[in-house]
């Protein structure tokens, strides 16, 4: 079973904790990659979907809505792939589904 979590989805406590950890990992890796590339970004927004299995493996990463900038889109996918694997699911989450699709808008702004 697959659970899709969008920005406006109602989530359980376990899912909220999982999303918080996931987001912190993404932001940490994103900050490192952006600093390492020393690129100044214009204001760009990209919508990504990360498909994660119950073990925390990233099984698919895709751009749902492009920023219009191929470099920004590629950076978003690179961040997802370098941040993986993520934490395994909480047992309550595993009881409900084996795959999680997280859909989020990511904003890239100049430093």
Put a short name on every predicted segment.
Residues 41-46:
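Short, small/polar residue-rich loop motifs at catalytic or cofactor-binding pockets
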